[in-house]
């Protein structure tokens, strides 16, 4: 029967002494005239399957497979759980599908992540990037599964839009080569920085919605946390309060992490061993944690008392927290995930609900050790006059988002939603510390390979 490596390891006991057919790529090859061992990987798992070739079954002089070559083999599966190699295939037939050139850049010696970034078309054939991308795939699946199980509707937010949802102005302009404006005169088309505004429109009718799409920021930042193109998960729920939103974000993260720990255990064990020791324990600790909620004002007090530990020591109310501050709160103060609420309104987007103090908004950031901000969300401003006033204060062109204001005229009693950067979550779950290694084809300043 045809099998994948992942299926073989998951069902090894039942498959013992079964005839198996498999296709994949050569990772290593070694041996002598009497016996040869080939490590094969087929992309379904970070684990390799050892193929055993014996001279009494075939002429080993004809077996010359270079690293990276694709092959097919069939034979009898041998399951020996107490042996160092618990599963191996005793090969009856083997053939070359496509030989790999000798200059295949991913060999058995350890390859740095920096080098792998120079070959984005091949780097997923390394163990590390393969493990990360398999985990990423499962994370995406379980995010969808969580929302679908909880009666959310997936909304396809547009990639091309006429408004800057965050109001930061860091957008990529979209146009054609024609002399005439493609979308008409006086229309500034950009790549979307968020699907939140469109999700909010659909929540006013479908109640529970989410978007899962690429977003774009023309932010000239060359840090480990920033990319020009990344994926955002943005749920929006009508009638929701900030408290309910925070509870949902914690529940969703725990659901996804628990499922990934079950589904991608082999990949996480590899990453725990080679990338971030203690990774699995930290994820299991997250599942057992209770999210602590703390006011932004309290955070400032804590940081002020500990400012000697920071590069940015100008601590005051109204400051935008740096990653070092966020990590300190999560790692040293809370010693786990923490939700920071009620940020100064000047730090947040125009659409957030203004608290009675007229100084803060009903917003939250969920901070986690090792990353800092993982999730950011808010209750939305449902009062037309308040929202209009805030738009004017920030000098946002009202005509571009009049439709968003108009939502408040037609039965809008409020909603709440958050944004989760998929790559940030991939980094947290895999232990990878650079966003460039959490996405298949990273787009960053001065970097547009492929």
Curated annotation (Swiss-Prot):
Location of this chain's protein in the cell: Cytoplasm
GO molecular function: asparagine-tRNA ligase activity; ATP binding; nucleic acid binding
Pfam families: tRNA-synt_2, tRNA_anti-codon
PROSITE patterns: AA_TRNA_LIGASE_II
Catalytic activity of the protein: tRNA(Asn) + L-asparagine + ATP = L-asparaginyl-tRNA(Asn) + AMP + diphosphate + H(+)
EC number: 6.1.1.22
Keyword entries, A-Z: Aminoacyl-tRNA synthetase, ATP-binding, Cytoplasm, Ligase, Nucleotide-binding, Protein biosynthesis
UniProt KW Endoplasmic reticulum keyword: no
InterPro entries per record: Aa-tRNA-synt_II, aa-tRNA-synth_II, aa-tRNA-synth_II/BPL/LPL, Asn-tRNA-ligase, Asp/Asn-tRNA-synth_IIb, NA-bd_OB-fold, NA-bd_OB_tRNA
Annotated signal peptide: none
Gene Ontology, cellular component aspect: cytoplasm
GO biological process terms on file: asparaginyl-tRNA aminoacylation
Record-linked SUPFAM superfamilies: Class II aaRS and biotin synthetases, Nucleic acid-binding proteins
Family the UniProt entry places it in: Belongs to the class-II aminoacyl-tRNA synthetase family.
Assembly: Homodimer.
PANTHER family: ASPARAGINE--TRNA LIGASE, MITOCHONDRIAL-RELATED, ASPARTYL/LYSYL-TRNA SYNTHETASE
The protein's name: Asparagine--tRNA ligase
Naturally occurring in which organism (per UniProt): Mycoplasmopsis pulmonis (strain UAB CTIP)
Gene: asnS
């Amino acid at each position: 029967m045809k099998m994948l490596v992942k299926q073989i390891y998951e069902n090894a006991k039942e498959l013992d002494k079964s005839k198996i057919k498999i296709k994949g790529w050569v990772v290593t090859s070694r041996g002598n005239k009497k016996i040869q061992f080939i490590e094969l990987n087929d992309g379904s798992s970070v684990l390799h399957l050892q193929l055993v070739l014996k001279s009494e079954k075939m002429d080993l002089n004809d077996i010359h497979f270079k690293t990276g070559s694709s092959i097919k083999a069939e034979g009898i599966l041998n399951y020996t759980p107490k042996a160092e190699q618990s599963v191996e295939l005793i090969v009856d037939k083997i053939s070359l599908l496509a030989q790999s050139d000798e200059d295949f850049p991913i060999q058995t010696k350890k390859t740095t992540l920096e080098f792998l970034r120079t070959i984005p078309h091949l780097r997923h054939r390394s163990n590390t990037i393969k493990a990360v991308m398999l985990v990423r795939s499962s994370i995406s699946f379980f995010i969808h599964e969580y929302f679908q199980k909880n009666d959310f509707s997936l909304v396809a937010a547009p990639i091309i839009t006429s408004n800057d949802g965050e109001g930061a102005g860091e957008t990529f302009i979209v146009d054609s080569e024609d002399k005439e404006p493609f979308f008409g005169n006086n229309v500034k088309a950009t790549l979307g920085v968020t699907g939140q505004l469109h999700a909010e429109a659909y929540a006013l009718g479908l109640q529970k919605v989410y978007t899962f799409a690429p977003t774009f920021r023309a932010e000239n930042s060359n840090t480990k946390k920033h990319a020009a193109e990344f994926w955002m998960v943005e749920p929006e729920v009508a009638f929701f309060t900030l408290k309910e939103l925070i509870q949902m974000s914690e529940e969703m993260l725990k659901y996804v992490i628990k499922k990934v720990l079950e589904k991608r255990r082999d990949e996480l064990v590899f990453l725990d061993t080679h990338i971030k020791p203690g990774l699995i324990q930290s994820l299991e600790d997250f599942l057992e944690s209770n999210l602590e909620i703390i006011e932004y004002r309290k955070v400032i007090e804590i940081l002020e008392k500990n400012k000697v530990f920071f590069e940015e020591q100008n601590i005051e109310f109204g400051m935008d927290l740096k990653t070092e501050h966020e990590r300190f709160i999560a790692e040293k103060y809370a010693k786990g995930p923490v939700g920071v609420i009620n940020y100064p309104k000047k730090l947040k987007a125009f659409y957030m609900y203004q608290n009675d103090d007229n100084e803060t908004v009903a917003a939250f950031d969920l901070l986690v050790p090792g990353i800092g901000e993982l999730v950011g969300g808010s209750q939305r401003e449902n009062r037309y006059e308040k929202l209009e006033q805030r738009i004017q204060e920030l000098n946002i062109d009202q005509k571009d988002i009049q439709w968003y204001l108009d939502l408040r005229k037609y039965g809008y009693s409020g909603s709440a939603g958050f944004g989760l950067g998929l790559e940030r979550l991939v980094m947290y779950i895999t232990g990878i510390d650079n966003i460039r290694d959490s996405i298949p084809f990273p787009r960053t300043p001065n970097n547009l390979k492929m």
